[in-house]
Amino acid sequence: MIGKEVTVRDIVLELSEVQPEVLPVDLFCDEELPNEQQAEEELDIDRVVFKVIAPCGCSCCEVKLRIFVNATNRGIRTFQELLTGDLQLLCPECRGNCKHGGF
């Protein structure tokens, strides 16, 4: 291109064969969605029982709390994030010393 404006002579088109990875995908494939019962069964298979040991959230208590949860891998990761974040578990004795709402 010479100059500030593009002319038709400056445009070069190159035609080549379409590569297989660029071919369009048929969105009307013959897949079937599972019914609700099958979906629920698949969710039940993914659940595992986990044993969680966490310290009491009170600063003066050294009690280790043990709870068991039935969760998916995603669910247990979310629970772990809560426990390492703002959520703290309390033992029954420390819970009795606290008032509802933390006041």
Curated annotation (Swiss-Prot):
The lineage's top-level taxon is Viruses
| Region (E7 terminal domain) location | 1-45
**Where are zinc fingers of the kind unnamed found along the chain?**
56-94
- Localisation: Host cytoplasm; Host nucleus
Keywords recorded for this protein, A-Z: Activator, DNA-binding, Early protein, G1/S host cell cycle checkpoint dysregulation by virus, Host cytoplasm, Host nucleus, Host-virus interaction, Inhibition of host innate immune response by virus, Inhibition of host interferon signaling pathway by virus, Interferon antiviral system evasion, Metal-binding, Modulation of host cell cycle by virus, Oncogene, Transcription, Transcription regulation, Viral immunoevasion, Zinc, Zinc-finger
List all disulphide bridges recorded for this chain.
none
Q: How is it modified after translation?
A: Highly phosphorylated.
Q: Name one GO biological process term.
A: DNA-templated transcription
Keyword Transcription in the entry? The reply is: yes
User: Would the keyword Zinc turn up in this protein's UniProt record?
Assistant: yes
Q: Which SUPFAM superfamilies match?
A: E7 C-terminal domain-like
Query: Where on this chain is Nuclear export signal (motif)?
Result: 76-84
Q: Where is this motif: LXCXE motif?
A: 27-31
> Could you name the Gene Ontology cellular component terms for this entry?
host cell cytoplasm; host cell nucleus
User: One GO MF term, please?
Assistant: zinc ion binding
Q: Family assignment?
A: Belongs to the papillomaviridae E7 protein family.
The protein's role, per its UniProt record: Plays a role in viral genome replication by driving entry of quiescent cells into the cell cycle. Stimulation of progression from G1 to S phase allows the virus to efficiently use the cellular DNA replicating machinery to achieve viral genome replication. E7 protein has both transforming and trans-activating activities. Induces the disassembly of the E2F1 transcription factor from RB1, with subsequent transcriptional activation of E2F1-regulated S-phase genes. Interferes with host histone deacetylation mediated by HDAC1 and HDAC2, leading to transcription activation.
* Quaternary structure annotation from Swiss-Prot or TrEMBL: Homodimer. Homooligomer. Interacts with host RB1; this interaction induces dissociation of RB1-E2F1 complex thereby disrupting RB1 activity. Interacts with host EP300; this interaction represses EP300 transcriptional activity. Interacts with protein E2; this interaction inhibits E7 oncogenic activity. Interacts with host TMEM173/STING; this interaction impairs the ability of TMEM173/STING to sense cytosolic DNA and promote the production of type I interferon (IFN-alpha and IFN-beta).
Task: Quote the record's domain comment.
Answer: The E7 terminal domain is an intrinsically disordered domain, whose flexibility and conformational transitions confer target adaptability to the oncoprotein. It allows adaptation to a variety of protein targets and exposes the PEST degradation sequence that regulates its turnover in the cell.
Which protein is depicted?
Answer: Protein E7
Record the organism. Human papillomavirus 47
Identify the coding gene: E7
